[in-house]
């Protein structure tokens, strides 16, 4: 695969009011929506709609059951939705509309909860080309990671939403899993494409990644029950030397997965790469002049979204790219 060369189209600037880009979507007309939070109060969440008309700030106001029960952003048709507490979807059919408030059903035929009552949503990026939306969760142990996932069936026309399944990923499929602990694989990002479910897995160790590095990472196709169908990427054991290693993965509104190394000391020297689910090849990313500190966030068609964080969110940029 050829390298990605980005050209700047549009830029939105911020004055450190917001924190990180937790998740993003790109609509076909180049409108972007990002999930972020207040820089000084990370429990105040916002959806920022970025278009040619400027920035529209949508406060996401609800009463969380804990400080880590995050809202979840997803793209659906020409609009977007926000999942609140695994109980309700706020669906915006377009960027100008008020949201439709759609309750989520969470019972089996035997009246059992599908998503456990104490499970907590994680805002990690999810992508889907269907009515089934994959969502990251944590359950039983709460460190801000995601070790579970659920599938939400959503229909904006019928205004219905219901949980279909709640699962963990089978660790035994991975070469470097650790049987000494019950920890299941962590999940960075989820994607559904052509009825296939994909997950990026940043290892399973509960130890601090910043302090010790990852134990392994992988990109896999999985079933709704968490069975590993295919390992597309699987790293070596990353704890075999005294260096720290690790790569995070983020699915996009395209065939590409954004790979971000955790440490600048690794073989990628801290530079992001893209990986194609179609060709199974890697590509380098070349940012426009003056934007070398930006991070790629999403890709759709020939458009991509980048962000700059420097003691707060400084810039969001819309670019096009060529890889011919």
Where are these regions (language model features)?
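Entry beta-strands of beta-propeller and related beta-repeat scaffolds
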Residues: 30-34, 79-83, 131-133, 141, ...
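Blade-level signature of beta-propeller repeat domains, shared across WD40, Kelch, NHL, RCC1
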Residues: 295-324
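Beta-propeller fold detector
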Residues: 7-12, 56-62, 110-116, 162-170, ...
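Beta-propeller blade signature
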Residues: 46-50, 96-105, 149-153, 213-224, ...
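Beta-strand-rich domains and repeat architectures in extracellular enzymes and scaffolds
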Residues: 13-38
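Short glycine/acidic-enriched loop and turn motifs that connect beta-strands
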Residues: 38-42, 88-91, 141-142, 148, ...
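Repeated scaffold domains used in trafficking and secretory/extracellular systems
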Residues: 18-25, 65-76, 116-137, 175-192, ...
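A short helix->beta-strand "capping" segment at the edge of beta-propeller domains
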Residues: 1-18
């Amino acid at each position: 695969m050829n390298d990605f060369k980005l050209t700047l189209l549009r830029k939105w600037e911020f004055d450190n009011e917001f924190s990180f880009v937790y998740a993003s979507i790109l609509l076909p007309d180049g409108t972007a929506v990002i999930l972020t939070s207040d820089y000084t109060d990370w429990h105040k969440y916002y959806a920022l709609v970025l278009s040619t008309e400027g920035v529209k700030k949508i406060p996401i106001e609800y009463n969380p059951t804990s400080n880590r029960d995050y809202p979840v952003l997803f793209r659906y048709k020409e609009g977007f939705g926000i999942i609140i507490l695994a109980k309700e979807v706020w669906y915006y059919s377009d960027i100008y509309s008020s949201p439709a408030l759609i309750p989520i059903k969470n019972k089996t035929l035997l009246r059992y909860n599908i998503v456990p009552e104490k499970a907590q949503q994680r805002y990690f990026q999810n992508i889907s080309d269907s009515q089934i939306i994959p969502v990251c969760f944590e359950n039983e142990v709460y460190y801000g990671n995601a070790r579970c996932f659920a599938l939400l069936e959503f229909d904006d026309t019928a205004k219905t939403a219901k949980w279909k399944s709640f699962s963990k990923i089978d660790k035994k499929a991975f070469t470097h899993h650790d049987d000494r602990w019950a920890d299941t694989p962590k999940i960075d990002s989820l994607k559904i494409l052509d009825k296939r479910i994909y997950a990026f897995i940043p290892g399973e160790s509960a130890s601090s990644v910043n302090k010790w590095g990852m134990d392994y990472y992988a990109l896999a196709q999985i079933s709704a029950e968490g069975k590993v169908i295919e390992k597309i990427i699987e790293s070596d054991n990353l704890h075999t030397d005294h260096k720290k290693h690790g790569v995070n993965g983020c699915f996009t509104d395209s065939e590409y997965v954004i790979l971000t190394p955790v440490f600048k000391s690794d073989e990628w020297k801290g530079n992001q790469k893209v990986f194609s689910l179609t060709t199974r090849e890697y590509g380098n990313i070349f940012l426009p002049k003056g934007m070398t500190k930006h991070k790629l966030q999403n890709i759709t068609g020939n458009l991509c979204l980048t962000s700059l964080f420097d003691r707060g969110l400084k810039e969001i940029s819309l670019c096009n790219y060529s890889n011919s």
